[in-house]
Amino acid sequence: MLAGGRCAEPASYHLTESITRHGITADRMKTGTPVRIDARSVHFEHMEIQEGENDFHRFSFISEPRKLKQLSCWTCFTNEESHEILRNGLSDSPLYNGQIQSIGPRYCPSIETKIVTFPDKPQHQLFLEPEGESTNELYLNGFSSSLPMDIQIAALKKIPAFKDLVIYRPGYAIEYDYFDPTQLKHTLETKAIKNLFMAGQVNGTTGYEEAGGQGIIAGINAHINCHGGEPFVLGRDEAYIGVLIDDLVTKGVDEPY
C-alpha cells in the first residue's frame, strides 16, 4: 500500500489533521477503479458493440444543438477460467486480506466482491468504454480490482476479447478520509469553522453528479458569505440536490451516499 493524493499528486498528510483539531470528526471510506486498456490490443470481434445515443433531450427547448461526437462502447463477459485465477489471488487483495477494511460503494462492487458474493454466477458483464476521442485508452467498467497487476492481466487474458491484452494502468483500490456531514449546515458550511465549505467525496458521497451538486451549493454560499447576503438553500420539495444535502446534514452516512 502506498500513500497518494489525486492522480499524479502527493498525499495531503496533514490536511485532515488541520481540520480535526477544530473538533470536526473524520473517518475512512474506500473506492476502487478498474484497469485501463490499450484499444489496439483488443479483439473487438469477440465483443458486442453498444452505440451511443443520438436522440438528445435537454431541459430547455432553446438549447444549442449538441456537437459532441458520440463514441461506441463494447460489452463482453468474464468466464469460469478468469474467475478461478481471481479466486486464487484473493489472499493478495487488500480488500480481502485485511489491509483495507473501510466501507465502499454498495452498487459498485469490485470483481473480487462479485465472485465471492455470487459464487454461483458463471460470468459477469464488462463494459469497455473509451476515455476520449483522441486516445487509445479504454476503461473496463465492471472490473474494479485491488488484486496485483499480474493477476488482473492473467484473468483478463482468459477472456477471448483480451487474449492479447496490453494495459496502461491496472485497477487499484483507494482508502480516503471523509468528514461526518452532520457537522455541516444546509449551506455546506462547517458549523465549527466559519467560511469553510465542504463538497463532494469529502462529505461521504460517491458519484460525479452528487459532487457537482454539492459544489454548486457550496460555491454559491461561499460567494454569498463574502458579500453578506442571505443563505441559498434548496428544500427537499424543490430539487434532488435539496434531498441529497438534507439527507447528509440530518442523517449522516455509514456508507458512500
Task: List where the protein language model places each region.
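Conserved mid-domain beta->alpha element of the FAD-binding
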Residues: 195-224
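Acidic helix/loop or adjacent segment enriched in Glu/Asp that either coordinates divalent metal
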Residues: 19, 210-214, 247
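A glycine-rich dinucleotide-binding beta-alpha-beta segment and adjacent secondary-structure elements
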Residues: 139-205, 232-246
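Short, conserved loop/turn and helix-capping segments at secondary-structure boundaries
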Residues: 5-13, 145, 212-213, 234-238
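An anion/pyrophosphate-binding glycine-rich loop and adjacent beta-alpha core
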Residues: 17-153, 241, 250-257
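Flexible, glycine/charged-enriched surface loops at secondary-structure junctions
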Residues: 29, 96-104, 162-170, 229-234
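Non-catalytic terminal regions with compositionally biased, polar/charged low complexity
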Residues: 216, 222, 228-257
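Glycine-rich loop(s) and the adjacent beta-strand/alpha-helix scaffold that form part
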Residues: 1-38, 159-160, 164, 217-230
